[in-house]
From Swiss-Prot:
Protein name: Uncharacterized protein YNL034W
Biased composition (Low complexity): 197-214
GO BP, sorted A to Z: sexual sporulation resulting in formation of a cellular spore
Bias-annotated ranges (Polar residues): 177-196
Similarity comment: family membership: To yeast YNL018c.
Region (Disordered), start-end ranges: 171-217
Top-level taxon in the UniProt lineage: Eukaryota
Organismal lineage: Eukaryota, Fungi, Dikarya, Ascomycota, Saccharomycotina
Amino acid sequence: MSTSFQEFKAFCNKVGLDFQWLNLQSSKSVPESGSSEGFSAVSDTVQENIRPATEPLNVNQSKDPVSNFFYDVKNAPLWNVYKRNHSGHSSTEACSGVSSGQASKNIPEAMVKETVLSNHDNVTIINELLPTSSAMHQEESTAMTTSYLLSHSVNDSCNVMLSSSSHNRAMLPPSLVQRNNATTSPTTDSASENNESVPSLTSSVSTSSSVYSSWNPPHSPHISSFPDGNFASLNAEVTCFDFRRTKDSRTKETNESIIPTEIYCPINSTDHHKHYPSQKSKQDACAPAPRNQNISCSVGSAAEFSQSNHTLTTVVPSYMQQYLDRPQNWFESKMGKYCPLFLRSTKNIDYDSLEFKFERKMIAVQYLLLDEQSEPRRYYNPSNKSIPFWKRPFNFDTMPSYDQLMEEAECRFYSYQYKYEGFQRIEPYSIFCPWKNTQREIDLVLDHIHFSLDVGEKKSLNRKGNITLDTLDSKVDPNIQIKPYQIFPSNNLVYEGLPHPAEQSLILSPGTSLIERAFQALIDICKESIPPSNDCTTRNHNSAPQLTVPEPSKPCRLLLVRESRTATELETNKKLWLHSQRRNIEVTVPMHPSEHGTKSRLRKWLSTFVHQ
């Protein structure tokens, strides 16, 4: 047996696949020395015996003994792939088109001896699965038929994906890798660069100067973009998704070398999901999703999902999806919101319903995005009565910015009246008077801003504060505090309302790097907390970046790592870890340390830092 074949068999045993090799020749016909002539003659004899009658002889075939051997295995694979059970023995169901009863009769059983060697990352399983030569001679005639059937069924029913690591590729001979490039499994998940992510509002909003352009609701990605019809659901009730990072192994038009990336062999002997894909979709709680996709895996509202990602992505809830899929007649489906009232099947609408509030929020988000992406927009408005009547037919007004609408909503907080509320008739969009549509959407944005201010108890909001607050999918806490949009968002920074002027420079100077700002903040803390003494050396001014600390306009507390609410003695004695070669800074600050002993603890934390 050649060295390449032994390495390939050891690789297959390592990844957990049981391969039983049916040797058609006696053990004496294959010399152990591995001579080129003897091995080539044996390979030619085996190839002529197992080649079907309908397949012509390839004259230009390579005479390399190793490539000839693997060419024989490719054309008539004498391999039976079994799923490994938890009990240790091979399952009776083969991964082929032959039934389990017929496979058990044609293939002799072999004693399996397993030696499990556990490492940090993988488990190596060594099997001795070669049957005796006498049993092989008895089943030689039946193995010929079984091997030919397996050659056409293994590629169809077995989902074997090879690993993409360099170690696993080195175990495979080049001839087998080239053969596998042409026959890959079409059921692997696609993770190419052109993946469709969750539909965001940025992609659905047009960048034209008209704010009353029709808003297309975000639909789910097309089913053809995901293999086997598996696509991520946009329902907010879905709480978890399975991420499988695999390259696209489907055949492409370009002449690229496509190599499968993983070996995926589920260890399950009771569920036969590959024969019943419908049962598999019912039992799987989490549907697979493509790579590079931001999906919230925790039970929460769409607001938490938007705030955690610092984006304007809005998940369509279930009730809104039903509202978008409501039955419409032919006129409504063709004309949309411009359909006249007498042609509509539904002529009334509840402006206080969750469906309309969601649509109003979408209009506000669209207005905000258009305000950010374009210059101050002008629209034709001949109904402006503040100008002389002879100028009105040629009048173009400037649309108010989102900041101006925010200021107007805050100024009229206690005297504001909703423009659209209650159960009323539907007001369709006008085709011949577009300025009325623009004014209607401006009023809807004001209604949404005032609704967010009213729910948030008139907290300080800015341009994105009321957009990230979702009052439709979750119950709003009456004591909720809306956090303003920070220009310096980061996962390791927690903003608190504790006044500390030393760390205000981290917020007011976003141009510098994180390590420089944290360095300067620690220097300022050391200046204010530790008095000058003779036993403590002064720091070198040339070793640290010099940053000016401006006067703080608003108190803000920056905590890098917060362990718990109650500061114990173990937490207060944490050491400061700071290395100049790395950009990671780990600082532990207690929530409410007592004033007694604060100076001594700060001196203990920053002693090494001050000596530098």
